[in-house]
């Protein structure tokens, strides 16, 4: 059974902007190299609508994979994995190995984790916050980028208290810090 990992880049002030990750572009090459290695262990990606629409370019726009050898590896890894999109508004999905679920359901996620050929990542702060509320997330992995956005969508939602234990940290030459935390215990009131 795979672990459910909330994995995302974030600015130092805890925001991801408005869902447009262009602010993380100066750090992309080194981050991509690190993530591609770790994502080889991922069997399934869970997305909300907006994050799915952002990530679908790795299959629908060949120019993304042609930017660098690391981008080509990531595109191949992403396309080979299963994807589940949780959305009540998306009409259909348009990438291979992808299915649509209308809402995040604890039982559905438990089945995905049990059947996945590796770990499962969840992306998108709204979907991840709901998964944290439902006590589904096993690992929180944040890529802290040395930039302040001053507002936007918070990477971690208010109203969810969880105890976390630092399992690893890695510093990149470009100032990014990758911090991996294991979720300890259950949801706190």
Regions from the language model: what does each represent?
Residues 1-189:
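Enzymes that bind and transform nitrogen-containing heteroaromatic metabolites
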């Amino acid at each position: 059974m795979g672990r459910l990992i909330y994995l995302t880049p974030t600015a130092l002030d805890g925001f991801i902007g408005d869902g447009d990750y262009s602010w993380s572009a100066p750090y992309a090459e080194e981050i991509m190299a690190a993530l591609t290695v770790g994502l080889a262990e991922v069997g399934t990606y869970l997305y909300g609508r907006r994050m799915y629409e952002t990530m679908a370019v790795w299959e629908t726009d060949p120019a993304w994979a042609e930017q660098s050898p690391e981008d080509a590896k990531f595109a191949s890894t992403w396309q080979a994995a299963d994807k589940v999109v949780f959305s009540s508004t998306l009409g259909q999905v348009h990438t291979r190995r992808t299915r649509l679920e209308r809402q995040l359901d604890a039982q559905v996620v438990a089945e995905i984790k049990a059947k996945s050929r590796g770990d499962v990542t969840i992306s998108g702060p709204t979907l991840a916050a709901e998964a944290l509320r439902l006590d589904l997330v096993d690992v929180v992995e944040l890529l802290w980028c040395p930039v302040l956005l001053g507002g936007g969508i918070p990477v971690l939602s208010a109203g969810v208290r969880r105890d976390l234990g630092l399992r690893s940290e890695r510093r990149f030459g470009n100032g990014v810090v990758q911090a991996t935390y294991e979720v300890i215990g259950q949801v706190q009131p």
